[in-house]
Each structure stands twice: as structure tokens, then as C-alpha cells.
């Protein structure tokens, strides 16, 4: 049998073993081995011993690191192969061209740096190419995501800025931010992001803030309502015009981490450290929990309400013969938890799917506007894409999307345009053309992520 090592390699190995034994005060064993190998003292003087003293440990750790790298690469190859198995040249081409099928790919278009601490939240302007980022460094930064340039830094909070959101009535878009300093602040983008109002009322850190969309049933100030979640276990609804708290929602028994409004503004979905998710009907005079969802084994970090475009993919899981009407909201929801799992729920509070794959806390969720996919980010540094048409199968894993934990994820909101008048539809009176009630929806294929590495990454088509 031919030797595996060359004579020189064998000699280096022997000297490394002897040096290791000597360094660990196993002198008798070292001398015995040296004698059996016929290495005299001249061939293994103090200089040689010093040279080989740590070589064995270095070789060993190198092998371990290499083995870990090989396992990681094998895992990546497996994920890529799975993606290829589910794709054809036609579907890949269509995915690149069709916004409803677009999936982000590495590398990011921009990796934006300026923050001096963890980025906690990102939010896109509903019309312009601006994106806001909130950080533990107590600042908000406004970027141009198309150019990859920093536009301005907003200061005002005295502690970490936890969440940001753009919203408000058409023509009066505002930026809302919330902080560990117990306050919510409103900033005016049309006036150099001047702080126009500060909302105070929570008794602990404010962990999430969201504008409630236009069309909230029963809302007197539709388009000017704001929802917030706090460590004080409550949710609050605010009038952005006056800064007054209109309602306080009690029900959670621990820190409320996240809140998400339905597209019509009728419902709020909330979740937190009591490991539950609650769906609230805020259209009634005395809002109360409509549904409470139990099932996670650890604190919940995030939640999202599915768009109506996803109903066709999720309704078969409930046994429905046809999906609910698009006008119906909060039919399906998703939650992400520190138990490393994502759960998909229906409006009755039934868990339809449990998605497993992340190796650490799940920090943020975003449904694809096209409805077919759900995206998630985690402390395991990955961004994952789950295909709802395949019962939540993970079809893409973007590994090392950030250098450290990924804390936030946001999809740029679609742009809604009034449908133009055209040939065909008539209201039957004098042959006048009738304008469609359905606005034209333009999906923006842009995703932003932020993390503990203090970087804001932009993935765009």
C-alpha cells in the first residue's frame, strides 16, 4: 500500500506531534516518539521545536473550518438545485420581466452605510424613490434608493428609534417614527422633514408605528389615523392631525412587538411577547379582539396581513372552493417568532401552515404584492422566499444577505394610479365612457433590509 504522505510531509507531521507533546509537558512520550522515529537532538533543536510548536493545532482548526465551509457550500448548492428544479427557462425569463413574479437576487444594488448602530426599521415613500431607516444611534436617515445616496439625517429622538412608516392622506404624506424615549414623532417630507408633532401617551418603549390606510370604516379622520404598539402591553390609535390618542386597545399580557393594519383600515393585527397574535376590528365604537391566535413556542417578533392577491394560493388550504372576494381583508395572516417558525393563519384563527427553515429568530415578514410569495429575514443572516402556491415551500435562500443579524425587511409599496378612460366601457347614458372603479396598480420591485451590521441593503429589479 503506497503511503498517503510524502517523506517531507511525514517528517513535518512527526515534528509537529513531537512539538505538541513537548509544549504540553508530555516529555517522556515526546522522547519515546523521537527515538522510535530516529530523530536525534540535532534534527530537533529548540529552534525547530519553536517552529513546529503550534503547527498541529493550526492544521487541525484549518481542517475543521474547511469542513464547515464545505458543509455550508453543500447546503447552498442544495438550495440552488431546488430552485433550478422548480424553474424552467421560460419561467425564469418571465420572473425577471413580470413584477408579480419578481424575486430579489444577490448582490444588492446598494449597501448604504452611515448609521453608527443597529438599523431597526426601514420604510419606503409611497411615491418617490426615498427610503427611511431608523437606528439605535437615535437618528433617522433618508436615502435615495435609486441613486444609493444619503439625502439627510433627522435628529430629534433622545433614545433608539425603533420603527418608521410613511403614510397619511394623498397630498399630505408624513413620516412617523417611534422610539424607546416613549414618543412618536411626525415629520413633514415636504418641509425638509421638519418635526411637526410629537405624540406622547405610552408608558414604555414604543415598538411599532403604522399609518392606517385610507378607507377605514367608521374612522372620522380617515387617512390621518396612526396605530402604535408598545412595551406597556397596549396598542393606541392616534389622530395624526391633532396628536390626540383616540383609543387604547388592551388585551395583550406582555410587550406588544408589532402591529399591522389591513389595507382597508378596518382591522389591526398585533403580536408580541405573550406568544399570541390578535386581530382587532377597529371599525366599531368599542374595538375588541376579534380573533386570538395561539401556537408559537416563544415570543413573537413580527406579523403581516396577506394581500388579496394571495387568496387564490391560500384559500385551498382552508378547503374553500373559491377564494374570498378581493374586497374582503384580513382573511389570512402571518406571524414570525423567536421559535424560528413562521405560521400562516386564517381569519378564524386556524393555523394553516407552519414554515420551518430559519436557524434563529425571525425578525420581519413581507408578502409579495403579487401574492404568490412570502419573504422573511432572521438573525441567521438569511432572507428566505416561501412559495404559497406550493404550500409554503422555501424556494430561495439568500445566505449572508447581511454580515450580522438582519432586523428588518420592507417591500416598496405599489403605486396606485386612477384607471384611465378608454374605449369600451359605457354607462349607457349618451354613450359616455365610464371610468373604471379599479385603479391601475404598479408593483415596485424593490426590497430594503437592515441589520446589526449598520447597513441598509437595497435589492431592486
Curated annotation (Swiss-Prot):
**The organism of origin for this protein:** Arthroderma benhamiae (strain ATCC MYA-4681 / CBS 112371)
Outline the subunit composition: Self-associates. Interacts with NDL1 and dynein.
Q: What Pfam families does the database record attribute to this sequence?
A: LisH_PAC1 (PF24951), WD40 (PF00400)
- Where found, per UniProt? Cytoplasm, Cytoskeleton; Cytoplasm, Cytoskeleton, Spindle pole
Q: Which family does it belong to?
A: Belongs to the WD repeat LIS1/nudF family.
Q: Name one GO biological process term.
A: microtubule sliding
Question: What InterPro entries does the database record attribute to this sequence?
Answer: Dynein_regulator_LIS1 (IPR017252), G-protein_beta_WD-40_rep (IPR020472), LIS1_N (IPR037190), LisH (IPR006594), PAC1-like_LisH-like_dom (IPR056795), WD40/YVTN_repeat-like_dom_sf (IPR015943), WD40_repeat_CS (IPR019775), WD40_repeat_dom_sf (IPR036322)
Family annotation (SUPFAM superfamilies)? Lissencephaly-1 protein (Lis-1, PAF-AH alpha) N-terminal domain (SSF109925), WD40 repeat-like (SSF50978)
- Recorded protein name is Nuclear distribution protein PAC1
Amino acid at each position: 500500500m503506497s503511503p498517503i504522505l510524502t517523506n517531507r510531509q511525514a517528517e513535518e507531521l512527526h515534528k509537529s506531534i513531537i512539538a505538541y507533546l513537548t509544549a504540553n509537558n508530555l516529555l517522556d512520550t515526546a522522547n519515546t516518539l523521537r527515538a522510535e522515529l530516529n530523530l536525534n537532538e540535532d534534527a530537533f533543536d529548540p529552534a525547530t521545536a519553536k517552529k513546529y510548536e503550534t503547527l498541529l493545532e493550526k492544521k487541525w482548526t484549518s481542517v475543521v473550518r474547511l469542513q464547515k465551509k464545505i458543509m455550508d457550500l453543500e447546503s447552498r448548492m442544495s438550495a440552488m438545485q431546488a430552485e433550478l428544479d422548480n424553474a424552467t427557462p421560460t419561467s425564469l425569463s418571465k420572473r425577471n420581466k413580470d413584477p408579480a413574479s419578481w424575486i430579489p437576487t444577490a448582490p444588492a444594488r446598494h449597501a448604504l452605510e452611515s448609521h453608527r448602530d443597529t438599523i431597526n426599521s426601514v420604510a419606503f415613500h409611497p411615491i418617490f424613490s426615498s427610503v427611511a431607516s431608523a437606528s439605535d444611534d437615535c437618528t433617522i436617515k433618508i436615502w435615495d434608493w435609486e441613486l444609493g445616496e444619503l439625502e439627510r439625517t433627522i435628529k430629534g429622538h433622545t433614545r433608539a428609534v425603533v420603527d418608521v412608516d410613511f403614510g397619511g392622506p394623498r397630498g399630505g404624506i408624513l413620516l412617523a417614527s417611534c422610539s424607546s424615549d416613549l414618543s412618536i414623532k411626525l415629520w413633514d417630507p415636504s418641509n425638509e422633514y421638519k418635526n411637526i408633532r410629537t405624540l406622547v401617551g405610552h408608558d414604555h418603549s414604543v415598538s411599532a408605528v403604522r399609518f392606517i390606510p385610507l378607507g377605514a370604516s367608521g374612522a372620522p379622520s380617515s387617512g390621518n389615523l396612526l396605530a402604535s404598539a408598545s412595551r406597556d402591553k397596549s396598542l393606541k390609535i392616534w389622530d395624526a392631525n391633532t396628536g390626540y390618542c383616540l383609543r387604547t386597545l388592551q388585551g395583550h399580557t406582555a410587550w406588544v412587538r408589532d402591529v399591522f393594519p389591513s389595507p382597508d383600515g378596518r382591522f389591526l393585527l398585533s403580536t408580541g411577547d405573550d406568544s399570541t397574535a390578535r386581530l382587532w376590528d377597529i371599525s366599531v365604537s368599542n374595538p375588541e379582539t376579534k380573533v386570538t391566535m395561539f401556537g408559537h413556542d416563544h415570543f413573537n417578533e413580527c406579523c403581516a396581513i396577506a394581500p388579496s392577491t394571495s387568496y387564490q394560493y391560500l384559500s385551498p388550504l382552508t378547503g374553500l372552493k373559491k377564494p374570498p372576494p378581493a374586497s374582503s381583508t384580513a382573511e389570512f395572516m402571518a406571524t414570525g417568532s423567536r421559535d424560528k417558525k413562521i405560521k400562516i393563519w386564517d381569519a378564524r384563527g386556524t393555523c394553516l401552515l407552519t414554515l420551518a427553515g430559519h436557524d434563529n429568530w425571525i425578525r420581519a415578514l413581507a408578502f409579495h404584492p403579487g401574492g404568490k410569495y412570502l419573504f422573511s429575514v432572521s438573525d441567521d443572516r438569511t432572507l428566505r422566499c416561501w412559495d404559497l402556491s406550493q404550500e409554503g415551500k422555501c424556494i430561495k435562500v439568500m445566505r449572508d444577505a447581511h454580515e450580522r443579524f438582519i432586523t428588518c425587511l420592507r417591500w416598496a409599496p405599489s403605486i396606485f394610479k386612477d384607471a384611465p378612460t378608454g374605449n369600451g366601457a359605457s354607462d349607457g347614458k349618451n354613450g359616455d365612457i365610464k371610468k373604471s372603479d379599479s385603479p391601475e396598480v404598479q408593483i415596485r420591485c424593490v426590497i430594503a433590509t437592515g441589520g446589526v451590521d449598520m447597513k441598509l441593503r437595497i435589492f431592486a429589479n
